[in-house]
C-alpha cells in the first residue's frame, strides 16, 4: 500500500490565480480573492446561460420550477453555509488556522458551487449522452483513426464536469492566459472526479480533458494534492477536501428541490411530499414542525412544503458538517470513500435514499422529463453530425456556411483536426436549450427567418 503525505489546510487554501501566479495587482476594494471568484462567475456569460438550461423538468412555463441557474444559486447558498460551519468547527480543533485564509472556505465553496454545472451541455445528461454516442455509435466513429487515443478517450466519455474545468481554465481565442483566472482553491474545489478520461469511473466520470491536464497538475502540485496513480498509469489524484462540501451542497439541493418541484407540478401529492420530507425527523421533531406550521398560520400546501423542505435542508447541512469534521483525517489523507451524504446518521440517510427512489420512479421517468430527454438527444445528435462534419471537412461549401455561425472565440479555423473538433464541441456544449433548438431548426430547414 502506497503511503501519501497528508494534505494540510495552509497549503490547500491558496489565493494564487491561474495564469497570474507571479502577479500581485493593486486592489481598490476590500473583497477577498475568493469573493472576486464568486463575483466573476456571477457576471459571466456561461453562468448567465444557465438560466436557459434544463435542470430536470422542462424549462418553466406557467408554473416556475428550477433551471440550472436557480439550482446553482441555491447550491451556492447551501455550500456557503457548509463551508462556514466546517470552518467554525475545525478552527476550534486547530486554532492555528484562525490567522490564515482558512476562515474563508465558505466563500470558496460557494464560488465552486456556482461553477459546478457550467460545463453541462443543453438538455443535461441526454445532451452528454448524445455527444458521446456520436463518436461511439454515430458517423463520428470513423474519426477514431484520425485522432490520438487520449483525445478519443476524452470525446467518447464527454463529461460536463471536465467541461466546466475547461471553460474556467482554457485560453479560448482572444482570452487571457488562465481563462477566467480563478484562484487555485476554487478551481480545485470543482473537480469532483480528479482523474483523466483514461481512468474514468464506471459511470464514465472524469475531471479534466487532456488539453487541461497540465493545468490541473500544476494546481495539484501547488496545493499538495497527492497523485494516486503510478508512473505510466492514467492520471488519478485525491480530491481537494472542499470538493466534498460542494458535492454535499449539490446532493442536498437537487434531491430535495426536485421533490418540491414535483409537488408544484402535481407529480407528487401533498400527502406524498409531506411523508417524504417528514421522515427525515424523529416523531417529536415532526410534531414540532407541524405545530409550528399551524402556529405560523400557514394554510397553503405549497408554503407548508417550503417550510418542511427548509427544515430538511437545515438538518442535512448540519449532518454533512458533522460527517466532514468526523472524517477530517481520512479526507486529508485522501482515503475517505463515498460522499458525505453516505456518512450521515441512519434516519436522514434512509430518508434521503427514499427520496432518491421516488425521484427515479416518479420524477425522472415522468412523461414531461422523458419528452425533453428524447427531444434533446435528437437535437444534439443532429447538431453534432452537421457541425463536427463541417469541422472535419472545412473546405466544403456547406461546411463554410455552418462554420460561419460559430463564435469567433472557438479555434474552428485551426489547422489541427482535434482542435477543430473540440471547438465544435465547445460551441455545442455552450448552447442554451432554446438556442440549440433554434440552430437545429434552421440547419434542418424547419424554420426560416423570412417565413
Annotated model-derived regions:
Residues 325-408:
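Substrate-recognition/cap regions that form aromatic- and gly/pro-loop-enriched pockets
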Residues 4-19, 431-451:
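Structural signal for terminal/edge beta-strands and the immediately following C-terminal loop/tail
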Residues 74, 244, 248-251, 312, ...:
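Charged, amphipathic alpha-helical oligomerization/scaffolding segments
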Residues 58-67, 112-115, 149-150, 234-235, ...:
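Glycine- and acidic
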Residues 397-448:
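C-terminal amphipathic alpha-helical interaction region
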Residues 2-30, 42-53, 62, 73, ...:
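Sequence-structural signature of the catalytic-core scaffold of metal-dependent phosphohydrolases
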Residues 36-48, 344-350:
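Acidic, low-complexity proline/glycine-rich segments
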Amino acid at each position: 500500500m502506497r503511503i501519501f503525505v497528508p494534505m494540510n489546510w495552509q497549503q490547500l487554501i491558496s489565493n494564487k490565480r491561474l495564469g497570474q501566479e507571479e502577479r500581485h495587482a493593486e486592489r481598490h476594494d476590500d473583497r477577498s480573492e475568493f469573493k472576486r471568484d464568486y463575483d466573476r462567475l456571477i457576471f459571466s456569460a456561461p453562468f448567465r446561460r444557465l438560466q436557459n438550461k434544463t435542470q430536470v423538468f422542462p424549462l418553466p412555463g406557467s408554473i416556475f420550477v428550477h433551471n440550472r441557474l436557480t439550482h446553482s444559486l441555491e447550491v451556492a447558498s447551501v455550500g456557503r453555509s457548509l463551508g462556514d460551519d466546517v470552518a467554525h468547527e475545525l478552527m476550534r480543533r486547530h486554532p492555528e488556522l484562525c490567522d490564515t485564509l482558512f476562515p474563508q472556505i465558505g466563500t470558496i465553496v460557494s464560488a465552486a458551487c456556482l461553477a459546478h454545472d457550467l460545463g453541462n451541455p443543453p438538455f443535461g445528461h441526454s445532451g452528454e449522452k448524445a455527444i458521446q454516442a456520436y463518436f461511439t455509435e454515430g458517423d463520428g466513429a470513423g474519426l477514431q483513426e484520425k485522432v490520438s487515443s487520449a483525445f478519443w478517450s476524452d470525446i467518447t466519455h464527454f463529461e460536463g464536469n471536465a467541461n466546466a474545468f475547461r471553460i474556467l481554465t482554457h485560453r479560448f481565442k482572444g482570452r487571457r492566459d488562465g481563462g477566467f483566472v480563478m484562484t487555485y482553491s476554487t478551481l480545485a474545489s470543482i473537480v469532483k472526479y480528479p482523474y483523466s478520461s483514461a481512468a474514468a469511473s464506471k459511470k464514465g466520470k472524469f475531471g479534466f480533458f487532456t488539453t487541461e491536464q497540465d493545468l490541473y497538475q500544476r494546481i495539484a502540485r501547488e496545493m499538495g494534492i497527492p497523485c494516486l496513480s503510478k508512473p505510466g498509469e492514467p492520471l488519478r489524484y485525491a480530491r481537494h477536501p472542499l470538493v466534498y462540501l460542494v458535492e454535499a451542497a449539490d446532493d442536498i439541493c437537487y434531491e430535495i428541490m426536485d421533490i418540491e418541484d414535483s409537488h408544484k407540478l402535481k407529480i407528487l401529492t401533498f400527502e406524498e411530499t409531506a411523508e417524504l420530507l417528514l421522515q427525515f425527523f424523529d416523531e417529536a421533531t415532526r410534531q414540532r414542525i407541524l405545530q409550528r406550521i399551524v402556529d405560523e398560520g400557514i394554510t397553503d400546501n405549497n408554503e407548508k412544503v417550503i417550510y418542511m423542505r427548509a427544515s430538511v435542508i437545515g438538518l442535512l447541512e448540519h449532518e454533512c458538517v458533522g460527517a466532514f469534521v468526523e472524517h477530517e483525517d481520512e479526507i486529508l489523507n485522501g482515503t475517505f470513500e463515498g460522499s458525505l451524504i453516505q456518512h450521515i446518521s441512519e434516519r436522514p440517510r434512509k430518508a434521503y435514499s427514499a427520496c432518491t427512489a421516488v425521484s427515479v420512479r416518479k420524477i425522472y421517468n415522468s412523461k414531461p422529463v422523458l419528452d425533453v430527454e428524447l427531444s434533446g438527444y435528437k437535437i444534439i445528435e443532429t447538431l453534432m453530425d452537421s457541425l463536427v462534419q463541417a469541422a472535419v471537412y472545412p473546405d466544403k461549401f456547406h461546411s463554410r456556411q455552418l462554420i460561419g455561425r460559430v463564435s469567433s472565440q472557438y479555434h474552428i479555423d485551426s489547422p489541427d483536426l482535434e482542435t477543430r473538433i473540440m471547438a465544435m464541441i465547445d460551441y455545442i456544449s455552450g448552447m442554451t436549450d432554446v438556442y440549440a433548438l433554434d440552430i437545429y431548426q434552421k440547419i434542418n430547414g424547419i424554420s426560416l427567418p423570412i417565413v
